[in-house]
Amino acid sequence: MDLSLAPTTTTSSDQEQDRDQELTSNIGASSSSGPSGNNNNLPMMMIPPPEKEHMFDKVVTPSDVGKLNRLVIPKQHAERYFPLDSSNNQNGTLLNFQDRNGKMWRFRYSYWNSSQSYVMTKGWSRFVKEKKLDAGDIVSFQRGIGDESERSKLYIDWRHRPDMSLVQAHQFGNFGFNFNFPTTSQYSNRFHPLPEYNSVPIHRGLNIGNHQRSYYNTQRQEFVGYGYGNLAGRCYYTGSPLDHRNIVGSEPLVIDSVPVVPGRLTPVMLPPLPPPPSTAGKRLRLFGVNMECGNDYNQQEESWLVPRGEIGASSSSSSALRLNLSTDHDDDNDDGDDGDDDQFAKKGKSSLSLNFNP
């Protein structure tokens, strides 16, 4: 393989470079002129670019563009595309490359025993300065396609690394990220589906009206979450104002019952009362209230008649309550209720005893 060798003297290399530049200019001049020699009336004839075979790319490192003035070629690529003669390994050889603009570049290519690497030294620093290469840029090496003479032609190209800030600005700019919330009139008809789950508004306090509304009102539920909007069914409408009634403190939950005393059992904690017995019993008028008592009421072991007062928790859990009603005047006939009331009011001899027997 012919690698365009040149003498190592500076004068001869400069002369060859000038000759290559003149040859390039002559080719451009001949291509710009037409068959008649008048290029004013005829369009410019463009020579198609030569066919090239890509060899390898090299991402330049800070040391490649630093003060060392050398470019390290990977060993596998150097031995494959730029083999060196062992007899001339010490001085190296000169390689000619043509860039995209048609300018010829000549680099000294050699092998360093100290670092055991293949490097390009002479002429590389001028290439870096002219192309303004920086760490991260890519240098591409190519060669011609065709016969042996075409394959001996070497080409060099370069491209700068992309500016990541501009790339990110271009990518994210297409999405139109902004923090301006849309107006209600413009986006009032646009809705987005919410996930399939039942959301319960979050309150600092519980209100029995709001609590029941949040569970049983299926037409419209207030949803408090990230952003602004109202929940109607399972659709979340954007642009709607937030209902601030859901985030303010509401009245606490109050149940109308007897206050709970520690160590005591209240009627609220007892089982529900069963319906009254249907058997006909004895009628008794007490404090102006008609009361009916079964015939075997006193003989029942358990009774669900619970007074509104407080009952000992220990006694109520192990035994039933027994209510004994006794009067000094037993009116078995129960003929006149009004007479009993008058007699009770005048004499005051009637008595009521409540015995809670364990």
From Swiss-Prot:
GO CC terms of this entry = nucleus
Biased composition range(s): Low complexity: 25-45
Q: Which GO terms describe its biological process?
A: flower development; leaf development; regulation of DNA-templated transcription; regulation of leaf morphogenesis
Q: Where is the composition biased (Acidic residues)?
A: 329-342
Source organism: Arabidopsis thaliana (Mouse-ear cress)
> Which residue ranges does the record annotate as region Disordered?
1-45, 310-358
As recorded in Swiss-Prot or TrEMBL, the protein's gene is named NGA3
**GO terms for MF:** DNA binding; DNA-binding transcription factor activity
Name used for this protein in its record: B3 domain-containing transcription factor NGA3
User: Where does the record say this protein resides?
Assistant: Nucleus
Q: Where is the composition biased (Polar residues)?
A: 1-14
Q: Which SMART domains match?
A: B3
The entry's DNA-binding region feature spans 56-162
Q: Which Pfam families match?
A: B3
PANTHER family in the record, alphabetically?
Answer: B3 DOMAIN-CONTAINING TRANSCRIPTION FACTOR ABI3, B3 DOMAIN-CONTAINING TRANSCRIPTION FACTOR NGA3
Describe its function: Regulates lateral organ growth. Functionally redundant with NGA1, NGA2 and NGA4.
Using the chain's own numbering, where are the disulfide bonds?
A: none
Keywords in UniProt for this one? Answer: DNA-binding, Nucleus, Transcription, Transcription regulation
Taxonomically, the superkingdom here is Eukaryota
Presence of the UniProt keyword DNA-binding in the record: yes
